Structure formats: C-alpha cells, structure tokens
Amino acid sequence: YHTWDRYTPNPDKRWSVSDQRWKLIGLFSKTKPDPTKWQLYDLQADPGETKNIAGQHPAEVRRLRKAFTDWFSEVTTGQTYRPVPIPVGHDMRPVELQPSWATWTGPHINYTFDGYDWDTIDGWKTRGEQAVWQLAVAQAGRYAVTLHYGCAPLQAGGTLRLSAKSQPLDHKVRATVTAEQFSQFPAGAINLPAGQTTLKATIHHAGPGEFMRLNGIHLQRLPNSR
C-alpha cells in the first residue's frame, strides 16, 4: 500500500496497491481523480509496467481498489492532519513559511508540488482567496516580510494583504520574467503578537488573471522591536 501527499493523506490523488502479480495505480496532480484513468499492470508478464490493462481486468481493479480503501480507512481513522504552528522570532533568525505548511480557501487557489523547494500556492485569482499559516511567536515585535513568488507580466498588478491580528500590510504584486521564475520582494514590516497566532495572505485586489505563484514568505524580527 502506498499513498503520498505533502499535506493531508488523500485516497484518490496519488496512491498505489500491489500484490505478487498485480499493481493498481491512481496518479492525479492538478487533474480531477478519474477511475477510468487508473492503471493496472501485470507484474509477472510486464515487470516494466509498460502496458495498462485496467480495461481488460475490471474484477482485479475492483478487488485491489477495495483492498486499498479498506487499508486507508484503517490507518487514518482517528488521526488529525494539520500543520503544526511554525516557531518564529528566536534570536532574530529569519524563518521561511513554506506553501506546504499553509491551509487555503477559495474556489481557484491550489497547492502545487513540482519539486523540493519548488512548490507553490497558485491558481488563485479572485478577491478573498487566501492562504493561512499557524505561527508560534517567541517574541512580540515588528517583523520584516519578504515574499518569494513568480507572476507572469500580463497578470501583475493585484494587491496581496498580509494580516496577523494587526494593521494589515499590503503588497502590490509585481511581474517576474515568467510565472515559474521566482524573485524576492521586500513587502515591509508587520507586527506579530507573542504566542499562537495566524498569518493570512489574502487577495485584497485581484489582478487580471492568476494572482501569483507564491513560493514562500520570509519573516525576520527587527532589532529592538517590541
């Protein structure tokens, strides 16, 4: 049995199950999971997994899928999957808030993993769509904010609002060479209270298309701030 997701285990997106002869795979990233696109391989006749024969063996597909979902239910029942609070503000060291540590809401916003240190929050394009990080702030104070993102030249111009129980910090989205080429943009400073808090990144004013591809947010406590 195998399932892989950088956020919450999902029985439909990236999974596989095998026995001594058969291997059934479901692999979906940005596309909607579709049982007609599951892949079945005969490991004895085709150890290289070159020929998908799911359509020829529907009974094996049903058997293996049931075995997988039974196992998935057993190992996930009673478990809570959510990001832990990120420690911020220790000895003035900068902290990077990665996309995979956030939760997100909105009709278009999406998390994409294209490689280590190459994951993004993307797809968002309407006012109110947001990503949220849980923080554990060691010291209250003002924190410098640096955004790491890409934005296609024709899509720039929207406004990202950062907030954490304080005066919001607005950043006008700037263009990069392409949406896949990230740059760092100082966004100003924000007040963070000590203890548990949330940092929200919200579309305040939408641009003409995809808002940005956010690759990370860097926070660094400013000297002598309280």
Across the structure, where does each feature detected by a protein language model lie?
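C-terminal cap/loop subdomain of S1 sulfatases and analogous C-terminal strand-loop tails that border
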Residues: 1-39, 43
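Helix-turn-helix-type domain boundary/helix-start signal
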Residues: 43, 51-54
